[in-house]
Amino acid sequence: MTISVQNKNVGRITQIIGPVLDITFSAGKVPNIYNALVVTGKTPSGDEIRVTCEVQQLLGDNCVRAVSMNATDGLMRGLEVIDTGTALTVPVGEATLGRIFNVLGETVDNLGTVGNKQGLPIHRPAPAFVDLDTKLSIFETGIKVVDLLAPYRRGGKIGLFGGAGVGKTVLIMELINNIAKAHGGVSVFGGVGERTREGNDLYMEMKESKVINAENLSESKVALVYGQMNEPPGARMRVALTALTMAEYFRDVNKQDVLLFIDNIFRFVQAGSEVSALLGRMPSAVGYQPTLASEMGGLQERITSTKDGSITSIQAVYVPADDLTDPAPATTFAHLDATTVLSRGLAAKGIYPAVDPLDSTSTMLQPWIVSKEHYECAQNVKQTLQRYKELQDIIAILGLDELAEEDRLLVARARKIERFLSQPFFVAEVFTGAPGKYVSLTETIKGFNLILSGEVDSLPEQAFYMAGTADDVLAQAEALSK
C-alpha cells in the first residue's frame, strides 16, 4: 500500500498492549474507523519498522485504538504513525491468480510483486437488493454424490465438515479444477488461522495437479490468501475479507462465477473474539464477542449471486468439542445452504470422495427447485442406503443368507450405489493413474436410476467402483469378465 507523502496525517503511539495500539493525532485530524495506519521508524538496533494496523475505536481526546496486522515486536511509545486515509487496500484481477498473499495483499511466495496496480478496499457494502439474482439454481460440480444428494446453490454457502485425512484438500482442489473447466470460473482460497504447513502442502499439491501453473501463472485457476495460526489476531480476523474482496472483483468486473474457499470459518470467529477482548468489550455467551452475529453477517452477506456473476462459498467448519450448539458453529449454520460431511468410515473403505450420503444435506433438494426425476432418484438412493445401514447389524450377527430375498436384493443394490458414489478425480490422477471424470447431472441421475430399477443387478459390484457414468460401469464389467 503506497502512502502519499504530501499532506500526510501523522500521529504518535501512546500505548501498546500486545497487538493493540493507542495512537494520538492532532486535533481535527483523527482517522476514520477502519482506516489503515502505518507505523514507521527504526528499532534500537537500527532495523526498519513497518507495521500496518486498522482503526477499531475512537477513544476521544484525538486518540484512536487500532489493531495491528503484523507482530508488534520492537514498537515503542512515541513512534510515528501515518494515516493512509483509506481502508486496507489489496490487489485484484488476473494478476492475483497463482500467487499467495497475506492479509495486506503483499505477496509471500518469493515471486516478486504483483504486476497490476489495481486495488480495492477490503471493507465494502454487500450488493444492493436490486442487483441480487433471486433465481434459485443448482451449481453443477461434476461430482456425483454432491450433485445428486446435496446439491450446491449458485451463489450459496456450503459447510464442509471433516477431520484430518478424509480427503478435504483433494475435494477442494477438484472443485477448483471443475469450476474452471465447466464454468470458466476462477477460485480464491482463504486460509484463515490454520496451520502454515497445511497452507504450504496445499500450494505444492496445487502446483503438482496443475491447478496452479508454475510455468505460466496466468493459466492458474486460483489465488491464495493466507493468514495462518501464528499471525496476530487482527490478521486472522481480516484475511477472509481480503480473499472475499479478490473474489468480488472477479464477480463484479469480470462477470465470472467464482468459488471462494474459507478454511476455517471458525478461526475467523475465534480471531474476532480475541480482538474483542483486547479492545475491552464485555464478552457474550461462552466468552465470544458481543458482535459475533453482525461480524459473521457482514462477511456472509457479501457472498452472493448478482445479475453479473456469482460467488459460491465453501467453508470448512471446525466444531469445538463436537458441540453443535457452540455460538460459533451455530451462527455459521444460519447462513449455510448445504452441508457436505466427509466420513472416515467411507475413507477407510477406499470410497472417495468420502462424502457421507446420509449426513450431507442441502436446502436445494426440493421438487420445485430440482427436477422431479432428480428429487425422486435422490430420495430412493437415500432410502436404499438407510435401509442397508439398518440391516448391517443383522448381517454382522446372522450373515447375509439369513435375510429375506427382498432385503438381500436391496443390500446388493445399496452396495452398488455406495461404490457408484465414488469417482476418479482429475487432481488425483497423479496418485491413482485413473483419468478423472466430470459427470453431468443428467448422466448421474441416469446411472443411479439404472441401479435402482434393477437393470444392472447382474453386474459385479467391482464394476461400479471408481466409475464415472453408467457407460463406464458397463465397460469395467466387460473388462472384469475377460
From Swiss-Prot:
CDD domains: ATP-synt_F1_beta_C (cd18110), ATP-synt_F1_beta_N (cd18115), F1-ATPase_beta_CD (cd01133). It is a peripheral membrane protein. It comes from Pleurastrum terricola. F-type ATPases have 2 components, CF(1) - the catalytic core - and CF(0) - the membrane proton channel. CF(1) has five subunits: alpha(3), beta(3), gamma(1), delta(1), epsilon(1). CF(0) has four main subunits: a(1), b(1), b'(1) and c(9-12). GO terms for biological process: proton motive force-driven mitochondrial ATP synthesis. It catalyses: ATP + H2O + 4 H(+)(in) = ADP + phosphate + 5 H(+)(out). The keyword Membrane applies. It is found in: Plastid, Chloroplast thylakoid membrane. PROSITE patterns: ATPASE_ALPHA_BETA. Its EC number is 7.1.2.2. ATP binds at G162, G163, A164, G165, V166, G167, K168, T169. Keywords: ATP synthesis, ATP-binding, CF(1), Chloroplast, Hydrogen ion transport, Ion transport, Membrane, Nucleotide-binding, Plastid, Thylakoid, Translocase, Transport. Pfam families: ATP-synt_ab, ATP-synt_ab_N, ATP-synt_VA_C. One of its GO terms (cellular component) is mitochondrion. Transmembrane segments: none annotated. The keyword Protease does not apply. It comes from the Eukaryota. NCBIfam families: atpD (TIGR01039). Produces ATP from ADP in the presence of a proton gradient across the membrane. The catalytic sites are hosted primarily by the beta subunits. Belongs to the ATPase alpha/beta chains family. GO terms for molecular function: ATP binding; ATP hydrolysis activity; proton-transporting ATP synthase activity, rotational mechanism. This is ATP synthase subunit beta, chloroplastic.
